[in-house]
């Protein structure tokens, strides 16, 4: 009987020691936003006021080999939004896995236009048609930067096939400029998939940043392709105040759909924690 007790205590102690190797900090942050939105007289607006809140739990820990583990879990309006676990290997790159679309690949760079607020199509309550988003369920990502060139890729095995994408970004070809191009495949059904492509360019000088981005989604169904053209310019008035103007135009190949044009101004002011 005494031997059994000793064995049990030894096993418990061993498990406790092993768990401390992955201990790290856990931080909680949140945001709260109140928005007023007005639309043209030809559209039904309802209540123009709305609010949104987010809570994010983030943790990190260092491994014995110098690598770092990062974890994030986000709730939006009290509902699960995204989660991600990432292994930062330094110069070798970052491997990530989670239920979030913007961790790597074409979804992370679906809208690269500078803005003081949200994307112009989001601020005016337009659709995200033409935005190259693969979705984020159980996605494996990898991203590495070397000599000013960043390679970002994503892979997700779904029931009907494989969602995958790759993006290449160049930040040092021209001083102040950034260029990127990416492509991906989104499986829709056993006989249908979307081929996506996006390309963008941004240039910054002093407090001004301007950009343009072209995206296309080639659908399997005939006459169903979607093209998006976006451009914006932002100006940092000072450390607290920024303003921007952007446009987003969506063209549908299907004649029964009406092309969508969005434009808008955004402004943000930071004061302390607000």
What kind of region is each of these model predictions?
Residues 1-274:
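Outer-membrane beta-barrel proteins
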């Amino acid at each position: 009987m005494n031997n059994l007790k000793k064995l049990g205590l030894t096993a418990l102690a061993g498990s406790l020691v092993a768990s401390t190797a992955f201990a790290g900090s856990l931080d909680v942050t949140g945001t709260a936003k109140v928005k007023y939105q007005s639309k043209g007289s030809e559209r039904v607006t309802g209540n123009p006021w709305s609010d949104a809140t987010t809570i994010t739990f983030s943790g990190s820990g260092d491994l014995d080999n110098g690598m770092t583990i990062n974890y994030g879990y986000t709730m939006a309006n009290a509902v699960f939004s995204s989660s991600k676990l990432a292994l930062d290997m330094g110069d070798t790159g970052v491997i990530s896995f989670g239920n979030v679309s913007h961790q790597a690949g074409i979804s992370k760079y679906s809208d690269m236009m500078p803005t003081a607020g949200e994307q112009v199509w989001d601020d005016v309550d337009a659709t995200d048609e033409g935005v190259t988003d693969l979705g984020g369920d159980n996605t494996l990502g990898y991203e590495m930067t070397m000599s000013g060139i960043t390679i970002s890729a994503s892979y997700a095995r779904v029931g009907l096939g494989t969602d995958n994408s790759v993006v290449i970004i160049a930040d040092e070809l021209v001083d102040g400029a950034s260029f990127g191009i990416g492509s991906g495949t989104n499986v829709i059904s056993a006989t249908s998939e979307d081929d996506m492509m996006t390309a963008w360019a941004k240039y910054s000088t002093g407090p001004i940043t301007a950009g343009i981005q072209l995206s296309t989604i080639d659908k399997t169904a005939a006459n169903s392709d979607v093209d998006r053209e976006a451009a914006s310019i932002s100006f940092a008035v000072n450390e607290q105040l920024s303003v921007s103007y952007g446009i987003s135009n969506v063209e549908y190949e299907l004649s029964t759909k009406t092309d969508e044009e969005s434009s808008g101004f955004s402004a943000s002011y930071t004061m302390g924690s607000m």
